[in-house]
């Protein structure tokens, strides 16, 4: 019953703006689940739901995984809008950006926590990325190109 309820909760928060535990409990009751606010509270904790402000200024429950995907999309957009070229030179990856954008692009790359990176250095329009091996440098170039090309 718990897994069915959890599935229903995910379905509800994806389709309806739920701002409070009471609203979620009400929606679950409409769907035929007999729940208390304490049960809903535990479910929210177990499902790792978080509240996020929507574009209308209201806070609603969302799934952390969706938050991660949204962050990756934002960081990919930064790269897509700033990077002009990417190449690997031995264990280094050289990323060229539009003027003044290297720091923002490097921060996006660092925030993505790409495991193959040992470190980044950003200038005004160039980023040097030290990678742990030649193979991983080639992989990183492919990953960055994939992000900027969509």
From Swiss-Prot:
- Presence of keyword Zinc: no
The secretion signal range is none
Q: Which GO terms describe its biological process?
A: L-arginine biosynthetic process; protein complex oligomerization; regulation of arginine biosynthetic process
Under which pathway is this protein filed? Amino-acid biosynthesis; L-arginine biosynthesis [regulation]
Q: Which UniProt keywords apply?
A: Amino-acid biosynthesis, Arginine biosynthesis, Cytoplasm, DNA-binding, Repressor, Transcription, Transcription regulation
Q: What do the Gene Ontology cellular component annotations say?
A: cytoplasm
Gene3D superfamilies the UniProt entry points to: 3.30.1360.40, Winged helix-like DNA-binding domain superfamily/Winged helix DNA-binding domain
Pfam family membership, one? Arg_repressor_C
Care to name a GO molecular-function term for this sequence? DNA binding
Q: Where in the cell is it found?
A: Cytoplasm
What family does the database annotate?
Belongs to the ArgR family.
Tell me the NCBIfam families matching this sequence: argR_whole, PRK00441.1
What's this protein's function?
Regulates arginine biosynthesis genes.
What is the official name of this protein in its record?
Answer: Arginine repressor
Q: Which organism is it from?
A: Clostridium perfringens (strain 13 / Type A)
The lineage, from the top, is: Bacteria, Bacillati, Bacillota, Clostridia, Eubacteriales
